[in-house]
Structure formats: C-alpha cells, structure tokens
C-alpha cells in the first residue's frame, strides 16, 4: 500500500533576506494509515534547500494534515517562473520507506516573493531503481 497525499504551499513565503525565504507546506495524508515525515528538500537550482531532517519525525494521522517549514533559496526576478521545481519528502508509511515527489511551478510576484502551484504528486518506494539494476 503506497501513501496518498496532497502537498501545497501554506500561505505566502516570508523573507529572511532578498533571496532567502521561509516557506510553509501543508501535507494532507489522504491514506488510511499514519504517515511519518522524516525529511524534506527542494532540489531545483532556482528554488532550492538543503535536506531538512525532522527530529522527531512529523507524524500525520490518516485523513489529517501536517505542516512543515523549509528555508528556500530563490533569487529570481519579479515576474519570473520556475518550472519543474520539486518538494521531495522522505517518509515512512505502513512500515516502509517512500519518497513523495511534488512537482511545482513557482511564480515570482511583483515584490519578488515565490508562490508555488502543485502540478503533480508521485510516490516511489525507496530503493525502487536498485531492483532494475543489473
């Protein structure tokens, strides 16, 4: 059984510096079992963060919401768009490790604030590519 979630930016980004933002994310666990969020990262070159570990992990009961904050680097000009950005979550679900990949489109408003739209969410078991390696 794989996790089912919805992830979206939870309100406006808050500036720490002109290119540094604290962004909140709402994670809705749509599954029938609890979801445990271990880590999150933003890997895109124009909308990025280091991996953030959650210690203790964030536990989200079935059919409930959780919230995380990630410090992101984004110095794009007002009016710019960043395509194919991602939020990647490392989670445990039903005693198995998973990656949740939320593909984002980032729009930079007229004040330089990034705002995301979630375009697609996929899940993959951790180690899935090793099964196909020779």
PLM feature spans:
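Short, solvent-exposed loop/turn segments enriched in Ser/Thr/Gly
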Residues: 17-24, 79-88
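Asparagine-centered strand-capping/turn motif at beta-strand->loop junctions
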Residues: 21, 25-33
């Amino acid at each position: 059984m794989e996790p089912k979630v919805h992830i979206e930016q939870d309100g406006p980004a808050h500036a720490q510096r002109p290119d540094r933002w604290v962004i909140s994310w709402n994670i809705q666990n749509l599954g029938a079992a609890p979801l445990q969020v271990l880590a999150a990262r933003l890997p895109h070159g124009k909308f990025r963060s280091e991996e953030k570990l959650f210690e203790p992990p964030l536990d989200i009961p079935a059919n409930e919401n959780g919230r995380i904050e990630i410090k992101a680097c984004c110095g794009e000009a007002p009016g710019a768009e960043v395509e194919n950005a991602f939020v990647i979550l490392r989670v445990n679900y039903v005693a198995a490790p998973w990656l949740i990949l939320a593909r984002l489109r980032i729009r930079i408003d007229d004040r330089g604030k990034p705002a995301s739209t979630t375009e697609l969410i996929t899940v993959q078991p951790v180690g899935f590519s090793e099964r196909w390696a020779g």
